[in-house]
Regions:
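His/Asp/Glu-rich mid-to-C-terminal helical/loop segments that flank catalytic regions of hydrolases
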Residues: 90-118
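Catalytic cores of processing enzymes, dominated by hydrolases/peptidases
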Residues: 1-87
């Protein structure tokens, strides 16, 4: 996963300037992100009370090159990007009181995902 700034940064595309930043951005790949994985993640984070967007403000995911080249559909990938405004004061870099809650939410998602994929 990654995190992103609560405000638009200078290097971002001009089209992002007007967009409201979601709390969670789910980055996908047309080959490696199956619909059921995306739906499950979207539902989980939405039910957790978080605002979710897909491929906004950032798109894509990471797949190791050997698998990407082969387009091996046994490999699944989803990028979970967290708005830093959820868990830290970006001006000072200090954790907010919500840090542990956000961390737990992400840990719980991974547990749910792992159990579902068994």
């Amino acid at each position: 996963g990654h995190s992103f700034s609560a405000s638009v940064l200078p290097y971002e595309p001009k089209g992002n300037q007007h967009l409201k930043r979601p709390e969670i951005c789910l980055g996908t790949d047309p080959v490696f992100t199956p619909d059921d994985l995306l739906a499950m993640a979207n539902e989980y984070f939405t039910k957790a009370g978080l605002e979710v967007a897909v491929n906004t403000p950032f798109a894509g995911t990471v797949v190791p090159e050997p698998f990407y080249s082969l387009q091996d559909k046994r490999v699944q990938s989803l990028m979970i990007e967290v708005n830093r405004g959820l868990y830290m004061d970006e001006r000072t870099g200090k954790k907010k009181e919500t840090f542990e809650e956000v961390k737990y939410c992400l840990q719980r998602f991974l547990k749910v995902l792992f159990l579902q994929k068994k």
